[in-house]
Every structure is written in structure tokens, then in C-alpha cells.
């Protein structure tokens, strides 16, 4: 599993999570294509992921990066960590992420680590259960981050003050 990182001129951090070779068998033999899974973030709470397919690896990666930039979401962080513990699932992959104290670092594996790094999370404890397929882990991580809300937004929805919520 590749874990390349680039910093672009737009200020986005780009990470390559996975490149996969796929074969289609035809009458004359096999046709190989490549799929790429990438994550892009600004390190301040905006993060996106994308998948790209092509006959060449660089083209697949480029398509995935463009898809990731189009598919960005805003994550409400509490400083350098999460607001509260989050559970999420996609397919057979289940992820659990919980906030950690300052200086803990990102304790997460594989694809989940890449997503959290580009999102700007610096202190988190995370675990992946079930399938560790990078595509499903990235989807599950995004689902969990997307569902997370700040105390201010919860208070506004309920028509109460933040102190009453906490």
C-alpha cells in the first residue's frame, strides 16, 4: 500500500492511499487497468477523497485527485482533535474514533490515518474493526467525520445555549 504525500500550490495536502491493478480477460488476453484511491485536505478541517481509473497509473492518480477536490467536506474539529467519540461503518468495515489529549498523536492505521492527517486532526485514538479494505475504511471514516457536529450547531438546532447542551 503506497502512502505518498504532496503539498500543492493551492495549500492542499494530497495522499495516495491505494493503487490497484485490475485485469479484464478478453479473447486476445488480458487488459490491465489501474484504480487509485486518494485523499486531499487543507489540514484545517476540509477533507475529500476520490477514486480514479485509467489504463496508466499516473492518469488514474490524477483523476482520483481531481475527484477528491470535488468531493470535499468540512469537519468540525475541537482544536487538534475530534469533538466526541464517533462510530461508523461501511460494508464490513467498522471504525471507531475518539478524541485524545494534546501530544497523543494520530494513533490509527492505514487508510484511516491518511484521512485524519490531511483533515488536520493531530490527536486521536482510532481503531478499524472487520474488513480493512482501504476503500471501505475511507468511506466509513468519512461517514463518521461527516456526521460529527459542533456543540454550537447542536445548540442552534435545539434552540438552547451551548452551556445547556454541555
UniProtKB/Swiss-Prot annotation:
SUPFAM superfamilies found in the cross-reference section: dsRNA-binding domain-like, Ribosomal protein S5 domain 2-like
GO cellular-component term (any): small ribosomal subunit
Biological role stated in the UniProt entry: With S4 and S12 plays an important role in translational accuracy.
This protein's UniProt keywords: Ribonucleoprotein, Ribosomal protein, RNA-binding, rRNA-binding
Keyword Ribonucleoprotein among record annotations: yes
Notes on the domains: The N-terminal domain interacts with the head of the 30S subunit; the C-terminal domain interacts with the body and contacts protein S4. The interaction surface between S4 and S5 is involved in control of translational fidelity.
Gene3D superfamilies: 3.30.160.20, 3.30.230.10
Signal peptide, first to last residue: none
Domain S5 DRBM positions: 12-75
A GO molecular function held by the record: rRNA binding
InterPro entries: Ribosomal_Su5_D2-typ_SF, Ribosomal_uS5, Ribosomal_uS5_bac-type, Ribosomal_uS5_C, Ribosomal_uS5_N, Ribosomal_uS5_N_CS, Ribsml_uS5_D2-typ_fold_subgr
Provenance organism: Azotobacter vinelandii (strain DJ / ATCC BAA-1303)
Family, per entry: Belongs to the universal ribosomal protein uS5 family.
Name assigned to this protein: Small ribosomal subunit protein uS5
Pfam families named in the record: Ribosomal_S5, Ribosomal_S5_C
Biological processes, Gene Ontology terms: translation
Keyword Ribosomal protein recorded: yes
Subunit structure: Part of the 30S ribosomal subunit. Contacts proteins S4 and S8.
Amino acid at each position: 500500500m503506497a502512502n505518498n504525500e504532496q503539498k500543492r500550490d493551492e495549500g492542499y495536502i494530497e495522499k495516495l492511499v491505494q493503487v490497484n491493478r485490475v485485469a479484464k480477460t478478453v479473447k486476445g488476453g488480458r487488459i490491465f487497468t489501474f484504480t487509485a484511491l486518494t485523499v486531499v485536505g487543507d489540514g484545517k478541517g476540509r477533507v475529500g477523497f476520490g477514486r480514479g481509473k485509467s489504463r496508466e497509473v499516473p492518469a488514474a492518480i490524477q483523476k482520483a485527485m481531481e475527484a477528491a477536490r470535488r468531493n470535499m467536506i468540512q469537519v468540525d474539529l475541537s482544536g487538534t482533535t475530534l469533538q466526541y467519540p464517533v462510530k461508523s461503518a461501511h460494508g464490513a468495515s467498522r471504525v471507531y474514533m475518539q478524541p485524545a489529549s494534546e501530544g497523543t498523536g494520530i494513533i490509527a492505521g492505514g487508510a484511516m490515518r491518511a484521512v485524519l492527517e490531511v483533515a488536520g486532526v493531530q490527536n486521536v485514538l482510532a481503531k478499524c474493526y472487520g474488513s480493512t479494505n482501504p476503500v471501505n475504511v475511507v468511506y466509513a471514516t468519512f461517514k463518521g467525520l461527516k456526521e460529527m457536529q459542533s456543540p454550537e450547531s447542536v445548540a442552534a438546532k435545539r434552540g438552547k445555549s451551548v452551556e445547556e447542551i454541555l
